[in-house]
Structures are given as C-alpha cells and as structure tokens.
UniProtKB/Swiss-Prot annotation:
UniProt record, GO biological process: intracellular potassium ion homeostasis; intracellular sodium ion homeostasis; potassium ion import across plasma membrane; sodium ion export across plasma membrane
Coiled coil region boundaries: none
Cytoplasmic side: 1-34
Quaternary structure (record): The sodium/potassium-transporting ATPase is composed of a catalytic alpha subunit, an auxiliary non-catalytic beta subunit and an additional regulatory subunit.
Function: This is the non-catalytic component of the active enzyme, which catalyzes the hydrolysis of ATP coupled with the exchange of Na(+) and K(+) ions across the plasma membrane. The beta subunit regulates, through assembly of alpha/beta heterodimers, the number of sodium pumps transported to the plasma membrane.
Membrane topology (UniProt): Single-pass type II membrane protein
NCBIfam families (UniProt xref): Na_K_ATPase_bet
Protein name listed in UniProt: Sodium/potassium-transporting ATPase subunit beta-1
Keywords, ordered alphabetically: Cell membrane, Disulfide bond, Glycoprotein, Ion transport, Membrane, Potassium, Potassium transport, Signal-anchor, Sodium, Sodium transport, Sodium/potassium transport, Transmembrane, Transmembrane helix, Transport
Gene Ontology cellular-component annotations: sodium:potassium-exchanging ATPase complex
Sugar-bearing residue positions: N113, N194, N264
Disulfide bonds: C126-C149, C159-C175, C214-C275
PROSITE patterns for this protein: ATPASE_NA_K_BETA_1, ATPASE_NA_K_BETA_2
C-alpha cells in the first residue's frame, strides 16, 4: 500500500468544493436553490395549516361564555387558611405556631374590607338576607361590566378578624373561612328535601341559601368535637351572589363567605373534621376530596 502523502486528504476537500463541476457538498447551485425552494414552500404550507386550525379554534371560543360548560364539574369547597395535607397543628401559648394561619386569613379578607367596596359604580348592596339569583344580563359585553354584590367582612362576626385579630387561634378556638369556588354562570340550587342531609343539619335547609355543615369525620371523635358556630348570611351561601360572570365581565366579584368557628375542640389530640355543602346540583367525588366538601385535621396543644 502506498504511503499517504502530506497532500492526501481522503477527498473531503473535493467533496466540500468541486471546482471542476462547480459543486458544493455534492450539489450545484441550481440543485441547492431547488431544495431551498422546496423546503420554503413545504414549511410555509405547514405553518399555514397550523395558523388556519388555530384561527378556526378561536372562532369557536367565546370570550365571555365557556363553550363546553356542560363538562365542568360541580364547584369545589375550599377554606382559608390552607395547610399542607389539610393538617393544622399549633400551640395556644406560642403565637409563632399559628401566625402563618392568621396572616393567610388577614390577607384573604383584605378584599372584603369596607374601604375596598365603596365605589357604587362597581358594587351594589344586595342585602344581608338570602334572596334569589340576580340576573345581570347575558354572558356578553353588551351591557358592560357587571356590578358585584357587597359582602361585608363584619358579617363574619367573631371570625372577621376585626375584633379578634387572631381569629380565635390564641384561645384554641380557631376559625376557618369557607367559600364555594367560582364557576362561570353556575347557579347552585338549594336542597328541596332532607333526604340526603344528616339529621343534625336539616334545620339549615331554607330557600335561597346553600347550607353548610361541619362535623367529626370519625365516630370516636364525636365527644371531642362539640359546639361549632357559623357566621355569614344566614350561615350559608346566599343565591343573590350568583351567577358569576367571569373575570372580564365581573372583575370585582366577591364570593359569599361562611366562617366556621370551632369553639370547643378537645386539646392535645388529633381531630379530623369534615365540612359539606348541600344542593341539588352539588355532588361529591371520592377522587376529588374538595368537590362539595373538604376535611381538615386539627391538633391543638396548650403550649
């Protein structure tokens, strides 16, 4: 085999540029131009198809009304303060153990301060007793921005944070602020019978309000979870705050709240409590523990 010379390059230089055939990487200028033109047209068509499908999709979307709302699940029931795994543990004699809960409640209730609801161009007084739904028109902007019902923080009484800034945590009598999550154009329907409601909660069934009831989740805790008080409009979610028209049409909307006050919990033991709302179109799911209900675990110690 002849020895390789210093000029030997394996032919790669000629492959890069063949001066005899005027080829770059094995193709002439005309060939490269045809390939470039092909890919420009090919990817241009792909981009056109993609843009066309997006435009077609956007034509089916209403800016104000959900198209497939029949597939939306019933609203979830959530509470403030939230905690990891819904477990709340604190010491009555150590404010640092419950300060994060108190701060979360104050932050959440800022929007419900009277000073934030003074503009009567954005808010209206819907009363402090339950009423039927308020019809503010269709889900479009023909009538402009919808007014929101006022909900006064003071209606939460001892759980408002106005008189007791610790929301009962400093006494071992904690509060939870409960709300139904927002769903556009959803109208919760109150129960019409007591068939699906625990006997202890049947007195809460009344027109124009969605009742809420909390109790011990485990039978062995029945004697340890005693008096529970509820604050808000008729201790439930009044219908005049529904429906919700969405962020664009209802930017000032305030959800009605219910404060749950646990006034007599046994200390130094783990207690699991479940809260549920009751309505004709409110369902529960084992796969979603916040659909129409939630449970929370308290562990309260003296110090």
């Amino acid at each position: 085999m002849p020895a390789a010379t210093k000029d030997s390059d394996g032919g790669w230089k000629k492959f890069l540029w063949n001066s005899e055939k005027k080829e770059f990487l094995g193709r002439t200028g005309g060939s490269w131009a045809k390939i470039l033109l092909f890919y420009v047209i090919f990817y241009g068509c792909l981009a056109g198809i993609f843009i066309g499908t997006i435009q077609a999709l956007l034509l089916t979307i209403n800016d104000f009304k959900p198209v497939y709302q029949d597939r939306v699940a019933p609203p979830g029931l959530s509470h403030t303060p939230r905690s990891e795994k819904s477990e709340m543990s604190f010491k009555v004699g150590d404010p640092s153990t419950y300060q994060k809960y108190v701060k979360a409640m104050h932050d959440f209730l800022q929007a419900y301060n009277d000073s934030k609801q003074e503009n009567m161009m954005k808010y209206e007084d819907c009363g402090d007793t339950p009423k039927s739904y308020i019809n503010r028109g269709e889900l479009d902007n023909n009538q402009g921005i919808k007014k929101a019902c006022i909900f006064r923080r003071s209606w939460l009484d001892k759980c408002s944070g106005l008189e007791d800034p610790t929301f009962g945590f400093s006494e071992g009598k904690p509060c939870l602020i409960v709300k139904l999550n927002r769903i556009v154009n959803f109208r919760p329907r109150p129960p019409t019978s007591n068939d699906s409601i625990p006997e202890e909660a049947q007195s809460k069934v009344q027109p124009d309000v969605i009742p809420i009831y909390c109790t011990n989740k485990r039978e062995e805790d029945a004697a340890k979870v005693r008096e529970i008080k509820y604050y808000g409009i008729q201790e439930g979610f009044p219908l005049q705050y529904y429906p919700y028209y969405g962020k664009q049409l209802h930017p000032q909307y305030l959800q009605p709240l219910v404060a749950v006050h646990f006034t007599n919990l046994t200390m130094a033991t783990e207690l699991r409590i479940e809260c549920r709302v009751y309505g004709q179109n409110i369902a529960y799911s084992d796969k979603d523990r916040y659909r129409g209900r939630f449970d929370v675990k308290f562990t309260i110690n003296e110090s």
